[in-house]
Amino acid sequence: AKYYLPGSEHLFCKEHNLAFTSQSGHTQDDLDWVDYEVECNIHFTYHIVQPLDNRKSDGVIIVFHGLNEKKWDKYLPWAYALSKRTGKAVILFPIAFHMNRAPERWSSRQEMYPIAQKRMAEYPDNSDTSYVNAAISTRLDAFPQRLFWSGLQTYNDIVQLITDLRAGALPNIAPTATVDLFGYSI
């Protein structure tokens, strides 16, 4: 799915024989990474919570988090409760460029605070500027299409996850398991 990200040389439509050039905006804050090359966004892990009864789960709930989330802490009790009450496995799936799919420095107060201060000076009417959203705001400001492209990447990653599930690649979940989607954002 990484081929959908800005910076990829593989943006091509076979049906229309049309190649797309990547047009990403530029930032002045060392956040101008080529999306296609953010390794932690391409190769990532996800958590699975399930009952400990040593059987393959015949159902799975894929949980999506909200925009700009950085940690699974508040979702773990929910995943546990969902798994316990339904008997299904729960997969905590990180959307593109979030959680463990974003460089750690994007969550660093020390590194993002100066960027937030600069944004506050540039956009004085924005009263919600903080180091917490400095990276995502700066990157989306430079290239708003990132929201669409990362959504498309997440969609394709989920298609791959379900393909792997159906092929039996998730040993504690039955290949015939039902799949439910659960999204939450504050």
Annotate each PLM feature.
Residues 1-56:
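N-terminal cap/lid segment of alpha/beta-hydrolase-fold proteins
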Residues 1-4, 91, 95, 181-186:
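Short, charged N-terminal helix-start/capping segments
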Residues 34, 66-74, 83-85, 146-153, ...:
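Conserved aromatic-histidine-acidic binding/catalytic patches
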Residues 41, 59, 73-77, 85, ...:
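Short, well-structured alpha-helical interface segments that form or flank functional binding sites
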Residues 45-125:
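Short, surface-exposed "cap/lid" segments of acyl-processing enzymes
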Residues 57-63, 139-141, 185:
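Glycine-rich, often proline-containing surface loops adjacent to acidic residues and nearby aromatics
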Residues 108-172:
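Alpha/beta-hydrolase active-site loop
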Residues 170-185:
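Alpha/beta-hydrolase fold nucleophile elbow
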